[in-house]
Amino acid sequence: MKNDDIAILVLSIQRKGANKTVRYLERNNFDDYTVMIPSGLDDEIAESYGDHAFVYDVDEMKKKVDFMGTDIQNGASVGRMACNDWIRTRPDYKMAVVLDDDYGGVVSDYTTVPTLNNRTFYEIVKAVYKLGKDLGIITGGYSGGAHPDTKKNIMNVWLIDKDIEDRGLNKILNEDVCYSIMCWHRGKANFGLGNVLRSGAQTAEMEKLDGNTKMIYQTDRSYRKSFGSVLADPRNAKLAYNSGNIKRGALWHHKINWADICPKIILEG
């Protein structure tokens, strides 16, 4: 696969000047990118990106998204569905990297991989994509739920292609985790791209502990909350709540039994 076969898609509802990911893309000479913008916003937002903008029909995408009986219509899940449709109708591309508009660390010169640049970014993406295809892994990662009552957002890094199933990309908040656990039970791992591409600047997140209390803990959002981190060290799973331990690893929305979620590709490979 050549670099030209890979599209870069950025989910955004902001004008260009406020889009951190686009700022870093342009700073590091990533000229070929598309900003996925939901319909119903001010025309000025799409206009600020010029030819890089693609406005998708929110209502059409929502028809395809399964919200598991909830009323939470998460913008990220709808946006990812739009990316699914986009890549399927683009014969010039074989796959796409989907980024959140505040995930500039992946393509910036401030990442935890200081040598990351245009060339190495594509090489890493291609290597992880090939690994996922060879092993039947859904390649993607998210960090979300920090402010579920106000933002209802998910931070995205996903690798998608024309073969990806809609249902695999339309989960929201806890349901992302539920979907991942379901896949692991069936022998398919959900691997966080944040394991190899992550921003050291994402060091604080808030977890709602009860109706009124929130606590800030230090973590690398995309890695420490990914299944890859649990795969690397089972102790990263949230086995029990410990209010005195602010470095207790990945804070899942469910208690996890490591033996139950070990993927069959590890146990039987």
Kindly give the residue locations of the regions a language model identified:
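Short aromatic/hydrophobic "clamp" motif used to bind/position activated sugar donors
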Residues: A96
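Conserved catalytic core of nucleotide-sugar-dependent glycosyltransferases
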Residues: G104-H185
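Active-site-proximal specificity loops/subdomain of glycosyltransferases
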Residues: I37-Y93, G104-V113, N117
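Catalytic metal- and UDP-sugar-binding loop of GT-A-like glycosyltransferases, i.e.
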Residues: L99
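Well-ordered, non-membrane alpha-helical segments in soluble/globular domains
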Residues: N19-T21, V78, P114-L131, Q218-K225
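Short, well-formed alpha-helical segments that are part of the catalytic scaffolds
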Residues: V10-N29, I37, L41-A46
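C-terminal catalytic/acceptor-binding lobe
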Residues: D4-I6, Q14-K20, K171-L173, V177-G269
